[in-house]
């Protein structure tokens, strides 16, 4: 029996596209958990909130979800700033962030879900855009635009964040705040302000990730929970605080899931993907590019 090379190549490309989306979903966690050491378990809820905002604007005004996500970036940034301020004053300042802080984000996750259920119900919602149902074909290679467009936007988002974190004073301060807050204070930078900015940026990325999610698939309020395990797994696999490592890990997880789904069925994909995670961490406990 001849090996289906064409099927494998399509699965590889689909995995890369899926990995790009996973990277956009995970980048916020990579900042809050990987750099700031804040276990924001509610991050997927903010992503779903971004999806619903994109849905409302798309249905009522016909605006493209990606454009909507860019327009609401300031809203999500200030929402993230507010959430961090509450978290800092209530838990971090008192040294209670470990358990009570985690409970705070769990509560935020479920409260957001309940509000969305009360407003929208549990029916799946989707958006309309000219490219969503379009597939580009190059010989045997299929490129669904509902995956290609999110991949391109993800890469642009990640490139912008990498530039910001490595080339600007605030970005370098964000990287430094996790390593030496005292040295940062001596540089006339307020560590709490820097952490608030970083956390706000992490929540702002959820607006874009939410728009990409609803382009790829219909959403309902609890869909975000499906991604909790994946995003933390990608963050740890890539190496804590390493944006390039996170991108590589997201691509690897996407490829493993895609190939497994293609040849063995979707039900095997999560098990094989997390098995791959465990093996990798057994070999490299610090992650792929962990420090």
Q: Can you describe what each PLM-predicted range is?
A:
Residues 2-14, 21, 165, 169, ...:
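Inter-helical junctions in multi-pass inner-membrane proteins, predominant
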Residues 5-14, 61-67, 96, 137-151, ...:
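Interfacial loop-to-helix junctions that mark the boundaries of transmembrane helices
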Residues 7-60, 88-96, 100, 239-243:
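Single transmembrane alpha-helix segments in multi-pass membrane proteins
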Residues 18, 138, 142-219, 243-249:
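Helix-loop-helix "hairpin" substructures at the membrane interface of multi-pass membrane proteins
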Residues 36-39, 60, 68, 78-123, ...:
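Short loop segments and helix-boundary regions at transmembrane helix junctions
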Residues 43-46, 216-244, 249, 269, ...:
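Glycine-rich helix-loop "coupling/hinge" segments at transmembrane-helix boundaries
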Residues 110-138, 262-269, 289-291:
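Extracellular/periplasmic helix-loop junction at the C-terminal end of a transmembrane helix
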Residues 119, 179-186, 190-193, 263-291:
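Cytosolic-side transmembrane-helix boundaries in multi-pass membrane proteins
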């Amino acid at each position: 029996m001849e090996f289906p090379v064409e099927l494998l190549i399509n699965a590889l490309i689909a995995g890369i596209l899926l990995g790009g989306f996973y990277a956009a979903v995970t980048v916020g966690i990579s900042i809050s958990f990987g750099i700031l050491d804040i276990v924001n378990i509610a991050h997927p809820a903010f992503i779903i909130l971004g999806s619903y905002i994109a849905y409302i604007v798309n249905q009522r005004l016909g605006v493209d979800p990606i454009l909507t996500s860019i327009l609401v970036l300031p809203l999500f940034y200030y929402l993230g700033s507010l959430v961090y301020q509450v978290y800092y004053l209530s838990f971090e300042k008192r040294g209670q962030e470990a358990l009570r802080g985690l409970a705070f984000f769990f509560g935020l996750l479920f409260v957001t879900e309940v509000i969305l259920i009360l407003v929208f119900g549990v029916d799946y919602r989707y958006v309309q855009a000219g490219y969503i149902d379009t597939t580009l074909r190059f010989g045997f290679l299929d490129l669904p635009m509902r995956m290609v467009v999110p991949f391109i936007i993800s890469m642009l988002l990640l490139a912008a964040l990498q530039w910001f974190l490595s080339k600007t004073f605030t970005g370098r301060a964000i990287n430094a705040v996790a390593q030496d807050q005292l040295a940062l204070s001596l540089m006339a930078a307020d560590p709490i302000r820097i952490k608030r900015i970083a956390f706000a940026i992490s929540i702002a990325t959820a607006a874009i990730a939410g728009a990409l999610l609803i382009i790829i698939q219909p959403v309902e309020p609890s869909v975000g929970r499906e991604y909790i395990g994946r995003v933390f797994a990608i963050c740890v696999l890539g190496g804590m605080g390493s944006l390039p490592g996170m991108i590589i890990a997201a691509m690897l997880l996407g490829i493993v899931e895609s190939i497994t789904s293609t040849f063995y069925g979707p039900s095997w994909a999560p098990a094989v993907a997390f098995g791959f995670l465990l093996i990798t961490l057994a070999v490299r406990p610090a992650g792929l590019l962990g420090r």
